[in-house]
Amino acid sequence: MSKLKELPLSALQFYATAPYACSYLDGRMARSQVATPAHLINADVYSRLVRAGFRRSGIFTYRPYCDECHACTPCRVLVEQFEPDRSQRRAWRRHGHLQALVAPLTYVEEHYSLYLLYQSMRHAGGGMDQDSRDQYEQFLLQSRVNSRLVEFREPPGSPEAGKLRMVSMIDVLDDGLSSVYTFYDPLERNASYGTYNILWQIRQTRELGLPHLYLGYWIAESRKMAYKARFRPLQVLTGNQWQAFEDDGVSAATAAPPDEPGPVQE
């Protein structure tokens, strides 16, 4: 019998969900293509799926599979060529003092409290601000791949030493890091925690000697997702090919629908 790590992508099955309300674009319906069974999706297989445009939520591995909309475009940063712009350099200077601790996925009550505060202030009414502990754990702390939790705190000796500012979940792939989810202190109005987190992940990807930081989906029409285009050079996946992001050349209107999982042209 083949070992799990040797099983090919063809051992998986893919099915489409029923339509549901899109969480990114108001008034639209969405569908997802789901990869199963979950126990066959180890770190190696998941790396290939991410290159084909998939993401995960807990042990649920999926990608957009909508009937008429192709607004969700997978994107990744070429970390060796990345140069921060002026506002990104300011964010790094503002938050570079934070102390980062990388750990396995673990439940911490302090993290959960910050998550609820973040959801209540940044995504009120979206449903996630009412997540129970079980829902939080299923969403962020369950994984069958190589995942890490990173917490960012004020350093010793600072006025608010030890204060939790941000928590980020990342997956380690064979060709980079994948940014899973991030939540942070929403009471700091002049902070740029989200930008700093991506800059930190870019630096970590470089230090690991890996070429890509996967940022999930870029959605031109979604204010929550459009910020990803600021991290250049950026590549986007259209059909089965990764290509350079161009403001006028790749958009929600031109992005191709996903093909069946298969070889991806790098």
Curated annotation (Swiss-Prot):
What top-level class of enzyme does the UniProt entry assign?
transferase
Arranged from A to Z, the UniProt key words for this protein are: Acyltransferase, Cytoplasm, Transferase
Q: Which domain of life is it from?
A: Bacteria
Q: Catalytic activity, per the record?
A: N-terminal L-glutamyl-[protein] + L-leucyl-tRNA(Leu) = N-terminal L-leucyl-L-glutamyl-[protein] + tRNA(Leu) + H(+); N-terminal L-aspartyl-[protein] + L-leucyl-tRNA(Leu) = N-terminal L-leucyl-L-aspartyl-[protein] + tRNA(Leu) + H(+)
Q: Which GO terms describe its molecular function?
A: arginyl-tRNA--protein transferase activity; leucyl-tRNA--protein transferase activity
Q: Which GO terms describe its cellular component?
A: cytoplasm
The record's section on SUPFAM superfamilies has: Acyl-CoA N-acyltransferases (Nat)
GO aspect biological process, one term: ubiquitin-dependent protein catabolic process via the N-end rule pathway
What InterPro entries has UniProt attached to this entry?
A: Acyl_CoA_acyltransferase (IPR016181), Asp_Glu_LeuTrfase (IPR017138), N-end_Aminoacyl_Trfase (IPR030700), N-end_Aminoacyl_Trfase_C (IPR007472), N-end_Aminoacyl_Trfase_N (IPR007471)
The principal localisation class reads cytoplasm
Q: Where in the cell is it found?
A: Cytoplasm
E.C. no: 2.3.2.29
Q: What does this protein do?
A: Functions in the N-end rule pathway of protein degradation where it conjugates Leu from its aminoacyl-tRNA to the N-termini of proteins containing an N-terminal aspartate or glutamate.
* Similarity comment text for this entry: Belongs to the R-transferase family. Bpt subfamily.
This chain's protein is named: Aspartate/glutamate leucyltransferase
Organism listed in the record: Cupriavidus pinatubonensis (strain JMP 134 / LMG 1197)
What are the leading ranks of the lineage?
Bacteria, Pseudomonadati, Pseudomonadota, Betaproteobacteria, Burkholderiales
Gene encoding it?
bpt
